[in-house]
Amino acid sequence: MLNPIVRKFQYGQHTVTLETGMMARQATAAVMVSMDDTAVFVTVVGQKKAKPGQDFFPLTVNYQERTYAAGRIPGSFFRREGRPSEGETLIARLIDRPVRPLFPEGFVNEVQVIATVVSVNPQVNPDIVAMIGASAALSLSGIPFNGPIGAARVGYINDQYVLNPTQDELKESKLDLVVAGTEAAVLMVESEAELLSEDTMLGAVVFGHEQQQVVIQAINDLVKEAGKPRWDWQPEAVNDALNARVAALAESRLSDAYRITDKQERYAQVDVIKSETIEQLIAEDETLDANELGEILHAIEKNVVRSRVLAGEPRIDGREKDMIRGLDVRTGVLPRTHGSALFTRGETQALVTATLGTARDAQVLDELMGERTDSFLFHYNFPPYSVGETGMVGSPKRREIGHGRLAKRGVLAVMPDMDKFPYTVRVVSEITESNGSSSMASVCGASLALMDAGVPIKAAVAGIAMGLVKEGDNYVVLSDILGDEDHLGDMDFKVAGSRDGISALQMDIKIEGITKEIMQVALNQAKGARLHILGVMEQAINAPRGDISEFAPRIHTIKISTDKIKDVIGKGGSVIRALTEETGTTIEIEDDGTVKIAATDGEKAKYAIRRIEEITAEIEVGRIYNGKVTRIVDFGAFVAIGGGKEGLVHISQIADKRVEKVTDYLQMGQEVPVKVLEVDRQGRVRLSIKEATEQSQPAAAPEAPASEQAE
């Protein structure tokens, strides 16, 4: 009854298996993909009919990790998986971006892709496996899809490209690049790098695209054997007469509107033209559909903008193809934050802050691939007012998570190592205005805010978004694209880096036929733009400030013996808790005996260091200490001698005469001088009041308050 069809192939150092026909037979298509022991089950369901009035393509991609895949039970209260994590959201976007452009224009049937990680090898990331699975399932489904696509991860180790490196290899790699594309063209690139050259990055893209051809071939072979018949779907016939009528009413007016340089004014004028045109046409013929008219008007808009660019005319806002919008760069704009900057590029603006915290503030991520700690946090917020709209405000959406991750990639390469700068750093970018490339504005603002905070970043970084308009062999690469140019163009190509190289590259291509030469032109043009922006940024601040903010915690580091760690922590954390409250500092102890004391007040930090040194000091036999009685028992008294240490004064060592009752001589809390007689192998301390008194004050009674004793 169950007749699975299986295809295996070698992919770099891994063996990939594609299997269909075994599970989820009621889905439109389902594939189990495994790479070594990492397995992802991917299903696709497509609706045969579109919803009435549907005017956009409702594609949903869900990626979900099951903890059983790693042999674990979820740690949440309900012991089951909850809403998608940030990592799951990012991988869902990674799957979505290369497949979305391959559905035909006009196809608006609902399609859902669900990728479930069911087994994981900690050395093999499931993201590439899930992308291959989505490509295979869509290709098998019969849904109109111009795939398949392949996907590959490329590393760069010892000046060599590595296909699908393991997690251990990635730690040694200067590059982590994911590339996806069809047999003929690259569609998507997502990467972070340690300031590599444009040629090295382009080489990685080409290498990954070449290597993934084996994936595409394997999927094609599977489709030949197990694929479903392609749906009999045809786009709606073009109504040439209606198109001509709409163009006659609106084309020249839209062309004039797209010469208005102010975004809000332009949008208002375009909306007026559209509504008046639709209103007039429906008045003439009530059978016309407003959605269809809207699509025709959108096509006219697109043609107006694109034809103007291809003809070499000025862009929407009057710029030439390689011009950058006006820049305004300010630092230290918020008085009490640790670091802040306001970066404005045309009608795109980011208010960026940097906050310093201790290692305790780092984020602990309990991921399927294992637990890790992240000491550099980057959060991107895109409120509705940034584009002059109203809307919901709440938890971050997929787009905000994706843009924040891209901006973080852009800055990560220049962040200092924790051993040199032992702070957790959080950067927050508030997009206050947006008209294209707000994620790259966040990179620029983050670099400025980090410098303002005194974070010793290795170099300043800046980001730029490039666009493309291509018709046949004629193409134009645009620098610093507007939102409209992104929406109406063929490519969104974001590059971040320093003067020395690229730290992040993200590319989304909406058409096939983007050649290596076009990517080379875009990278070189982006480099010129990046260097221009860095030049302007350096006029505002050209190096990290010499000291961190007075409002930031200063971290002081001392070293103690590892066998003294338990003394500083105390039973159940009692000593370190009391120290923290007493000194007003934050104290962290590492396994190697490194102690980090964080305080905004230098005197408090010095006091905390002194107290820790007291606690960890070795008890000297024969030395006299000032002590305080902490417990009284029948056979003597326990006396604390500082540093969390306590010793026993036997009843015979209280006075130079026979003592019948300890409480006749000592009271709780009384201060007394004590001499250390012995520290045994178990660390127990034997003390004497009698000898301390005889040595320092022979005639004094032991009840008298002890005075400070010299060594």
Swiss-Prot record:
Entry GO terms, CC: cytosol
GO biological process: mRNA catabolic process; RNA processing
UniProt superkingdom: Bacteria
Transmembrane segments: none
Cell compartment(s), UniProt: Cytoplasm
Region (Disordered): 690-711
The S1 motif domain, residue ranges: 622-690
Main enzyme class: transferase
Record protein name field: Polyribonucleotide nucleotidyltransferase
Organism: Salmonella typhimurium (strain SL1344)
